[in-house]
């Protein structure tokens, strides 16, 4: 009956919806020929638990806390969690500025309104000070005034802003239910119902409908629907069906989530997306009694956060769509004030408090404490009052292992220690969404990959030493290319179907991508050896038969990168090394990446080739120019942007077999000699 109610609640949406780019929109609209009969989500809607606990019927608040639990939280705020709560109160955004007036269509404006509602409402329920209640009302009124939740030309009412506002207004309505007038409750409830209907109709199962379960544009809006469903569960007949739909979709979201804790979209998207996974799991557990946390990707998530962080604590190993690369690292660019407000890295590290609490993980708590010492900041500090377990014994970061291998995504991280002066590096050679995805695609035929935030970067590496990011990635791009990474080009071409839009992996068989892998990891006291095979990362039209890279680090001696490359037809092969600032030519065939007072010395050579004549290394130093992300709905249509420089090292003539060798060593920038290590 509830499934029928959802179907009857359908509202026709505008046809002119825009996705991230044209190809992604077409994939979203296309019906899958693999799906026959009833959509798989309907069975999940019937069988998965989504009923509100009987004791919560007719009760407010209930989504995340009850009145009894609020009493306990008020005591925490004055005792064990006093410092955390003071920090949260100092950052209540609804007290610092008015909400944007309608239509509030600037990027992320409505997202902030949603978070501000929840923050101010919760602060009021803990403090009892009416200034927080008045601020929450003001922001809720603003949300009601927005006719469209989101962007009018890009999935209006059904995308990220809708998820944020349903979450904020849903929980705000639930928390403040008894503090609002009858007229206010009616007005807020009617707006919530209207917006939830729009979103539920968009996400409901339809014949042939596919879902990008692992992509944030699915689980962020659907989290908002789930929160609204539990807030309104017994106040509108459609709400139970919304809860069913959300639980069904989340069944697949969790099943397709990372097996090893690594987040494929990149650390910027871990920061942005992970709160919504936690918000749904917490709301669902509190509302229904069902705990969905116990999955390897959540147990291991703190490893991804810890090892992604650079020793400096102000940036990360930035595989995937992450900020603006060299610009952000230099404190420049349009994104820096958002990513580093007042110079503090915004990481949402307090999410690890929740994982530490749930899994009783002293390691996760230790990672969070380490990030806090760097002065990092969170979007929702107020959650720390609920999440932080003051009784949990912390494992300090210094006692945790300083390297980690993520076997499902085939990404490796190593550092000499946990100090700011550590030498650290990372190496990546795996399929965009992990090895488990190939089997899952067979199991879930309605799962549609949307891997645009992952990059064509197999067999690439990032190096950090002496407090400097020496070489690595380019950051978030509208059109990701292999040339943005420290990897290989074949006749100037890179991996997968790069250059055709934001998703370089669209329409590439995952069976081919799944052969991309790290084949050896050896960590010894005297050396670290990583071998990666990226042969099938490249399209068959390029004729690449073999691309195996060995990446070796020996403390005191530096790095050695050895590449074995074979092709079916002669091709010019090019290695790329990136610099945030500049690349300099030291001597004939010798180069350096300069990073302030430090430089990375580069000595390349070709050891063997199919050409009987000696093969020279041809070099070029170029500005690294890319397509920056465009506006919502046209991410691949951004402006051209310069981010650092790149060194291109090529065979002097087409060849079918080559062994490249690069020796990399770190020295002070004022040293004039070239290392022979």
Question: Where in this protein do the model-derived segments appear?
Answer:
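Short, charged N-terminal helix-start/capping segments
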Residues: 35-56, 157-160, 187-217, 454-458, ...
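Mature N-terminal, pre-catalytic/accessory segment of carbohydrate-active enzymes
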Residues: 20-84
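Extended polysaccharide-engagement surfaces of secreted carbohydrate-active enzymes
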Residues: 42, 47, 269, 274-677
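Aromatic-lined, polymer-binding surfaces characteristic
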Residues: 62-73, 77-78, 82-89, 93, ...
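Bacterial Sec-dependent signal peptides at the C-terminal "C-region" and cleavage site
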Residues: 13-21
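Bacterial N-terminal signal peptides
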Residues: 2-14
């Amino acid at each position: 009956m509830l499934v029928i109610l959802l179907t009857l609640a359908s509202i026709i949406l505008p046809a002119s919806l825009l996705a991230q780019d044209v190809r992604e929109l077409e994939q979203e609209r296309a019906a899958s020929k693999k799906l026959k009969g009833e959509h798989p989500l309907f069975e999940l809607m019937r069988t998965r638990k989504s009923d509100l606990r009987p004791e919560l019927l007719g009760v407010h608040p209930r989504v995340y806390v009850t009145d009894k639990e609020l009493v306990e939280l008020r005591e925490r705020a004055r005792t064990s969690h006093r410092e955390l709560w003071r920090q949260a109160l100092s950052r209540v955004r609804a007290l610092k500025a008015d909400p944007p007036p309608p239509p509030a269509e600037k990027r992320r404006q409505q997202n902030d309104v949603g978070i501000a509602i929840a923050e101010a409402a919760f602060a009021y329920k803990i403090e009892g000070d009416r200034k927080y209640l008045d601020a929450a009302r003001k922001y809720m009124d603003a949300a009601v005034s927005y006719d469209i939740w989101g962007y009018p030309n890009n999935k209006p009412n059904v995308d990220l802003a809708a998820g944020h506002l349903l979450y904020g207004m849903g929980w705000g309505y639930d928390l403040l239910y008894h503090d609002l007038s009858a007229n206010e409750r009616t007005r807020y409830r009617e707006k919530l119902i209207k917006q939830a209907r729009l979103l539920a109709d968009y996400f409901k199962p339809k014949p042939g409908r596919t879902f990008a379960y692992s992509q944030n544009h699915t689980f962020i809006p659907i989290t908002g629907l789930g929160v609204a469903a539990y807030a309104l569960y017994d106040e509108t007949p459609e709400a139970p069906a919304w809860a069913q739909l959300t639980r069904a979709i989340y069944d697949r979201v969790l099943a397709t989530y990372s097996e090893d804790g690594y987040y494929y979209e990149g650390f910027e998207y871990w920061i942005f997306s992970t709160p919504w996974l936690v918000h749904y799991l917490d709301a669902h557990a509190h509302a229904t009694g069902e705990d969905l946390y116990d999955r390897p990707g959540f147990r291991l998530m703190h490893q991804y956060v810890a090892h992604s962080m650079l020793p400096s604590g102000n940036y990360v190993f930035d595989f995937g769509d992450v900020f603006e690369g060299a610009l952000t690292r230099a404190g420049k660019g349009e994104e820096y004030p958002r990513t580093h407000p007042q110079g503090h890295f915004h990481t949402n590290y307090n999410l690890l408090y929740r994982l530490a609490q749930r899994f009783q993980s002293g390691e996760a708590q230790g990672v969070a404490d380490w990030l806090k010492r760097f002065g990092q900041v969170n979007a929702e500090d107020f959650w720390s009052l609920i999440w932080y377990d003051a009784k949990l014994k912390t494992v300090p970061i210094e006692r945790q292992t300083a390297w980690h291998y993520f076997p499902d995504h085939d990404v490796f991280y190593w550092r000499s220690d946990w100090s700011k002066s550590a030498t650290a590096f990372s190496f990546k050679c795996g399929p965009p969404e992990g090895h488990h995805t190939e089997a899952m695609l067979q199991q879930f035929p309605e799962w549609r990959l949307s891997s645009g935030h992952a990059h064509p970067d197999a067999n690439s590496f990032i190096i950090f030493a002496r407090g400097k990011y020496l070489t690595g990635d380019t950051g978030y791009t509208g059109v990701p290319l292999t040339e943005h990474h420290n990897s290989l080009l074949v006749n100037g071409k890179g991996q997968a179907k790069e250059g055709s839009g934001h998703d370089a992996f669209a329409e590439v068989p995952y069976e081919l991508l799944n052969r991309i892998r790290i084949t050896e990891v050896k960590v010894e006291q005297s050396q670290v050896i990583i071998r990666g095979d990226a042969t099938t990362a490249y399209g068959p039209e390029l004729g690449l038969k073999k691309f195996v890279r060995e990446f070796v680090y020996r403390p005191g001696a530096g790095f050695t990168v050895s590449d074995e490359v074979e092709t079916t037809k002669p091709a010019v092969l090019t290695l790329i090394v990136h610099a945030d600032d500049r690349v300099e030519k030291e001597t004939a065939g010798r180069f350096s990446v300069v990073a302030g007072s430090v430089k990375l010395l580069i000595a390349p050579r070709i050891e063997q080739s199919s050409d009987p004549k000696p093969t020279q290394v041809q070099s070029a130093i170029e500005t690294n120019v890319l397509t920056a992300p465009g506006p919502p709905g046209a991410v691949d249509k951004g402006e051209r942007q310069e981010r650092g420089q790149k060194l291109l090292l090529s065979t002097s003539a087409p060849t079918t077999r080559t062994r490249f060798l690069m020796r990399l060593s770190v020295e002070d920038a004022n040293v004039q000699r070239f290392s022979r290590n």
